[in-house]
Amino acid sequence: MDKNIQVETVVNKLKNIAEKKIKDQKYNTALAAISCAADILYTFNQKYTDDDLEKLTSDIGDNLKSKYNRANYKKCTDTILVYDGFGLDTRGVVRMYLNALGLNEYSVYYVTNSTVQDSIPTIKSMCDKYGIKIIYIDMADYEKCFMQLSDVFETIKPKAAFFYTTPYDSAASAAFHAYEGICTRYLIDLTDHAFWLGKCANDYFLGSREMSAYIEHFERNIPKHKCIKLGVNLLNEKVTDHSGLPFDLENTRYVFSGGALYKTLGDDNNTFYRIIDHILEEHSDIKFIYAGTGDNSELKKVVEKFPDRAFHLNERKDFFYIIQHCTLYLNTYPMFGGMMMKYSALAHKL
């Protein structure tokens, strides 16, 4: 069976499950089915949006919001909610937003997963610096996540909320949808190049490049006035811990690349890895580092072929140090990296 048809078949089955469970008021299972369908669409990336999934998510938000009395909800003029569905200390985008909001002296509440309490020291330090309050919620259970996030909205009554999360965060999408017309909601379009869920949950969509707006409007059918280009102020924090690096970066010639590994896959000619292979074959004094996570099936072949010269590292806080000392930064292909390319330009390594 054709892969596209297989994906459509599985996604339709999950939609049917979600629809049935919504009728049965089994919202946890319905949200799980929606999340699974969105994850599949993100992984195979055959389209950028799915109105059926958005409608199902909206229905859940509408049904569950009846548990809250909104008669006394008044916007708090200086309070901002920042929802982070990742909870990753190595991701720069959320720290850029927190830094900007903190510098402008907003009253900010940062909401993230309860499982990351002990693994986000950099974010905690920034929150302490600006007096940003951190709230942890249980994201392991879909309905509980919806309820706890809604409780945060009800408690702090934010004027605006930022939606920064995975492409398949059904619970948060439903919760944000429930506050339509009450709170101004902004989706940070981190995954501007692929499918994501949350169109129903936000008023405005913040992209950092022209491609973001093009796909938002022409592929996701978002009205132009809702598409906002908001550049990022790169955080260039000095990191002194360089432990775990495979060699002395300051005295070695090497090519560096990084980001989510799926951005290097899907090209019939395997161009990205052919370039790496050619460089290492032709230049015996050059090494290669890739920093990032995901499907490493192709990268593993390079590492095995050049065991002392090609290295795969996890996401690192000192990635800018690695960029600064590389001989060449190689962008990912066929999907270009956005933030990494900005940092490579800052380091004059393009």
In which residue ranges do the predicted regions lie?
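Conserved catalytic-core segment of nucleotide-activated headgroup transferases in glycan assembly
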Residues: 90-100, 217-308, 312
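Short His-centered aromatic/hydrophobic patch
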Residues: 163-170
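Active-site proximal beta-strand in glycosyltransferases
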Residues: 79, 176-193, 203-210
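A short, active-site helix/loop in glycosyltransferases that binds the activated sugar's phosphate group
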Residues: 34-50, 202-227
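Short acidic alpha-helix that forms the nucleotide-activated donor recognition element
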Residues: 151, 315-327, 346
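Conserved active-site histidine-acidic residue motif and adjacent donor-binding/catalytic loop
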Residues: 139-145, 293-297, 310-323, 336-337
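N-terminal subdomain of nucleotide-sugar transferases
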Residues: 2-132
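Acidic donor-binding loop of glycosyltransferase active sites
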Residues: 156-161, 324-336, 349
